[in-house]
Amino acid sequence: MITGFSVDMASRLLKLLNEEIPNPKVALHSATPLQLLVATILSAQCTDARVNQVTPGLFARYRTAQDYASADPAVLEKEIRSTGFYKAKARNLIRCGQVLVSRFEGQVPRTMDDLITLPGVGRKTANVILGNCFGVPAVVVDTHVKRVAQRLGLADTDDPEKIEIALQRVLPKASWTRGSHQLLLHGRHVCRARAPQCQACRLYALCPWEGKRPA
């Protein structure tokens, strides 16, 4: 699962990421765990920028889990239409609100096991909530983290959960949330799927990727 990335290399990696991205922040705008949960559900197959255009009005109208639980599907679909897959997302938001009300007293739960019982919530979304709302060390694996982890030799699998485990094994627990978010931002802006910016990459010396471009 891990392809030879040592503890010393992990330390160097985190040092370089801290230099490159000293203040990693979640791009999705939110003020509460419920808002971040909703925004993360909406972000599936959608840009964070687009979600951030939709959520101010949405959050003004839907303030509690009960508001989502009792939402009119047609109205909610219209409000989130621009995020794509709006029918499925509206259905998940309504069902999610209903589960929060019926099982969790309207509050976003604080454990992985509980979070992944919510409609539309997988490990990635759960880890976003745990790490950013509740201070629980959590490794978020999205398409950017997956790509960077594979290119750096941190993991040699396509399975997100296995990549999560691989990163947990090689990175200090205290750095899971911050480090995985730095990897995400590095993948988004530097280690791109197409036209990676290898010549500007601080991680170049650590990178064993055969496809990397000359510095």
Regions found by a protein language model. Give the residues of each.
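Catalytic cores of DNA base-excision repair glycosylases
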Residues: 2-215
